């Protein structure tokens, strides 16, 4: 992995969301790649239950500001970034007020899936692709997890 550029895309990641199999694997795999000399960047949604202040997220103005079309509607794309403590790995957060402001990831308090999870997933995927283009960074490997 030495010198390889790896784009790691995940729906969940420790320490930003509670620990589970997906969030922990999405932390450990990039950490190992990074420690072996890979150049890794992680992308995940900026769910409303992620504490921006505690995790020091900040908006990247040069990457934000475009709209993505989802179901014939223009939806603003906001990009935020933070670093995983002690790992020197950048995490890019795909954000949109309509899709990600609620204080949960996939389900409501009763355990019901949000009816727009499909639109949220499409917005996230499009947001990752557009942001990588704007970064002018071409990964050698793209890994999508969770």
Q: Residue ranges of each PLM-predicted region?
A:
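Nucleotide-activated donor-dependent transferases that construct or modify glycoconjugates
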Residues: 1-19, 44-47
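Structural motif
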Residues: 5, 140-141
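Short amphipathic alpha-helix
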Residues: 22-32
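Hydrophobic anchor at the start of a short beta-strand
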Residues: 38-40, 91, 139
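A conserved catalytic-core segment of Leloir-type glycosyltransferases
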Residues: 42, 46-134
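Short, surface-exposed connector motifs at secondary-structure boundaries
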Residues: 134-140
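Short His-centered aromatic/hydrophobic patch
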Residues: 144-146
């Amino acid at each position: 992995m030495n010198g390889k550029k790896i784009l790691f895309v995940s729906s969940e990641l420790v320490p930003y969301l509670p620990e589970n199999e997906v969030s922990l694997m999405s932390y450990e795999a990039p950490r190992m790649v990074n420690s072996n000399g890979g150049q890794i960047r992680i992308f995940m949604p900026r769910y409303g239950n992620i504490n921006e202040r505690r995790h020091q997220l900040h908006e990247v103005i040069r990457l934000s500001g475009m709209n993505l079309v989802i179901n014939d509607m223009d939806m603003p794309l906001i990009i935020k970034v933070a670093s995983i403590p002690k790992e020197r790995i950048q995490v890019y957060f795909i954000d949109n007020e309509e899709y990600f402001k609620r204080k949960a990831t996939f389900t409501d308090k009763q355990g019901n899936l949000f009816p727009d999870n499909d639109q949220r997933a499409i917005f996230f995927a499009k947001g990752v692709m557009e942001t990588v283009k704007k970064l002018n960074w071409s990964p050698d490997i793209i890994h999508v997890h969770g």
